[in-house]
Amino acid sequence: MDGIKYAVFTDKSIRLLGKNQYTSNVESGSTRTEIKHWVELFFGVKVIAMNSHQLPRKGRRMGPIMAHTMHYRRMIITLQPGYSIPPLRKKRT
């Protein structure tokens, strides 16, 4: 499934990790139930709440036409106490 694009690490998302809430950007066409099912299946955790919001669009000018580049939304996933998602790290060479 390619609904989840990547995890987000901002000041707010790092603060929310203490409350067992994980933040990621997802495709705008994905539904909450799809993302919830995928997270529970892939990571083996229990999701109790999901919040999402659209980020402000960024404009990109192509000649006289103004286009927008943001085609995703941010999802905050709250897990049941006792569950956690291991950090996703890239292996450095």
From Swiss-Prot:
It comes from the Eukaryota. GO terms for cellular component: chloroplast; ribonucleoprotein complex; ribosome. Pfam families: Ribosomal_L23. InterPro entries: Nucleotide-bd_a/b_plait_sf, Ribosomal_uL23-like, Ribosomal_uL23/eL15/eS24_sf, Ribosomal_uL23_CS. One of its GO terms (biological process) is translation. Keywords: Chloroplast, Plastid, Ribonucleoprotein, Ribosomal protein, RNA-binding, rRNA-binding. GO terms for molecular function: mRNA binding; rRNA binding; structural constituent of ribosome. Its main location: plastid. Part of the 50S ribosomal subunit. Binds to 23S rRNA. Belongs to the universal ribosomal protein uL23 family. This is Large ribosomal subunit protein uL23cz/uL23cy. The lineage of its organism: Eukaryota, Viridiplantae, Streptophyta, Embryophyta, Tracheophyta. The gene is rpl23-A.
